[in-house]
Amino acid sequence: KGSALVYDIKRITEKKPVDNAYDALKELPGVVEMNGQLTLGGQGATVILDGQVTNLTKEQLTQVLKSVPKDRLADVEIMYNAPAKYNVRGACININFLHETAQEQRLTGEVFGVYDQSHDAAFQERASLVYAGKKMSIDFMYSHDHGNSYKTTETDSHHSLSDGNVYDISTYQRSRTRGHNHQMRLSMGYNFAENHNLNVTYYGSYAPGHTKQETTGSINSKYGIDTDPWTHDIAADYKMPFGTNIGAEYTFYKAPQTQTQSSILTDGSLDYISNSRQKLNIWKVYVKQDHTLKNGWGLNYGATYSTSSDNSYQNYLSTVNRPQDLPDNISASKRENIVNIYAGFNKNFNNKLIIDASLAAEYYNNPSWNEWNWLPTVNATWIPSQGHILQFGFSSYSTYPEYWAVQNFTSYNNGGYGVIVGNPDLKPMREYSAQLTYVLKNKYVFRGWFTHTDDLFMQTLYQQPDVLRETFKVMNFDFQQQAGLMAAVPLKLGKWYSANLTALGVWLRQKDSDFYDIPFDRDIVYGMFTLRNDFHISSQPEITLSVNGMVRTKALQADYDLPASGNVDAALQIKFLKNKRATLKLYCADIFETAQINPYINFKGQRLDMDMSSYRHFGVSFSYAFGNYKEKEHKKVDTSRFLK
């Protein structure tokens, strides 16, 4: 389908032990979960819904996908190089949901529950209802996640000061978190005629939580944080039969926090209460136009305007009657504007060669930066014969930092030894990417790519030379370069066994010539391999055993070294009752407790070792569908730049 590879997700997952949209996506060739996020062919990917990007963060989008039953997915479009009309950056996964109407009014639904046990227990309850009429469809979903979590972090820091003194600071931190996450979505659609429809969607979440940390060793500390974030998002999308698409979206996000800390450090003490809040108002409007012309030509153009206001504050109050060097109280208000205007064309040469090219002009404005960028995207797809697809893509795009990262705020971790500071001078990063993808027999996928990213930003750690403090700060590097090869190969033995093997090899280089007083230019070659196995034990009732594994070799990130890691998961799914309405799943994740990466630093006098806990998860889930339940879905909000 043009520059997209379209997958029948229902057929791919119908006998696999997955029960939500997020896990269903991991069954697609080349889609791999890394650090809790979905990647495509070894690179980060943007997930969009029904062709539209939203204001939800990646973390919120992940939670939404995990609460959506897999049966609501119609198909999935994989784009290694998304055209400008999608207004996304680089690789893209477009989920198309079922939006059904019916000649007779119909109400269907599903109830779902899961119990998950690691060190502590967690739960989820979910209910979905879908109404289908002749013209109107209404879709409602509510989910409630709640429970406790526990983790430990052991840190050994060999801290050298400029006066020649060296301090060994060893800490052991225990963290306990309890909380709730309520999510609700209501989507209403009305079909006036073919290719003429209006959809309005509301999404809301409320996730109060409390975390308590205790640190012992060289530092003794008690720390607590209460969070109370709210999200409201409403979006409207109107498609007209002559190719016009207009829409608008509004997002409100409010995240108040209260922190308390009492610490005895190697060189002093720290006692305070801190109150902070991030409040965002984000508006977006867009208009798009597609023309289908003669002789296989197509033309598209459009514009998107988004504006956001960030009104945030942070206050510190000492809890002892002695002088302390606490951060200043700060209240900040910032506005950001982004304008994206694009035009593109496509040409189909007898279903053998398909060209899709576009050029976007993007304007970015905030109190620190004011700039225009030209963002070209080119895709050329050659189909020499049935079952063979060769695709070349080139693109350039910009990525913007989180709102909180560009505020001049300060907070603490590890009992006050770690100081997290903002960076108002952060610049957007600009990536240039080229890739070549070959699909053999419509199932084997081979891919090679190269990317160059100017002003790459990420959070770094630095041991200060004049004081016993570690500074965590999001900084711009000179550049990052990546070159990689990926192969995704499906395997099958009769009707009883099927599998997907994904092999990935990457060369990575990162350079920062002004990283404090220790500039770096580091590179490494690493590999990652995943194997997803499904054993089909019985058809009546339908019983499937899934055993999945992943291993990743040593990698790096700035001055960090990332040791090898991996995990093995298993799940047993049973579908029973009439029309397989009931589904029972038993699972165990991270069986050998090896998934956690324990980073360390040993670079130009900086030395740090971390050992973080990793607990296996086992649990059981049950779902029951009623009323010939088939699902549909709505779109999501990009909250990737909100405070987490």
Task: List the predicted regions and their residue ranges.
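N-terminal periplasmic accessory domains that precede
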Residues: 1, 21-24, 61-63, 88-112, ...
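Short acidic/polar hinge/loop motifs at secondary-structure boundaries
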Residues: 54-80
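Transmembrane beta-strands of outer-membrane beta-barrel pores
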Residues: 113-119, 133, 144-148, 204-208, ...
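Face-selective signature of the C-terminal outer-membrane beta-barrel domain
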Residues: 136, 181-208, 224-373, 381-387, ...
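Outer-membrane beta-barrel signature, preferentially recognizing the C-terminal barrel domain
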Residues: 398-448, 452, 470-484, 489-492, ...
